[in-house]
Amino acid sequence: MLNNDTFYPTPVPLIDRMIAKIKGRPQTVLDPAAGMAAIIERMRDYSTMDSDNRYCYRPYENCSYSAIEIDTNLQAILDKKPFVSLIDTDFLQYSGRDHFDLIIANPPFDRGDLHLLKAIDIMHRGEIVYLLNAETIRNPYTHSRKELAQRLAERNAEIEFVPDAFKDAERQTDVEVA
């Protein structure tokens, strides 16, 4: 495990729940808090049945995957993965010059509101699937959380609260996520 206080690798069952939220067929995907690319790897390997339940297929294996990661140790890990392109090092400073069909992430819980606001700002057309500390949604006591609550309401965002999501994770915590 890396020595990083904000790095909580996303458990596979939680990644699967996130993937199940995807409604479209993205071709370009960004994980702006990529860590070791667990979400991207799971998306590439994710398989599902066709609508007639006759055969299994992998709908996201040919997507173009981009990542942003601030931790230099994690950047070194990402650099060794040929299926992901590390395009920047700090999502909150990222210019948004690229266009993506999907932004999917588990950002640091202490900056989740700022990360999701940035994702909303740079998403021109497509979907956003984000994992946040539930308190970020339930307790909008800061300016950025209030702005996030307003912008989510304007977009009729679908929010699901998941208790004990990190109970059996590589790095455990009892935080509820949304």
Residue ranges, per PLM feature:
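Class I S-adenosyl-L-methionine-dependent methyltransferase catalytic core
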Residues: M1-A178
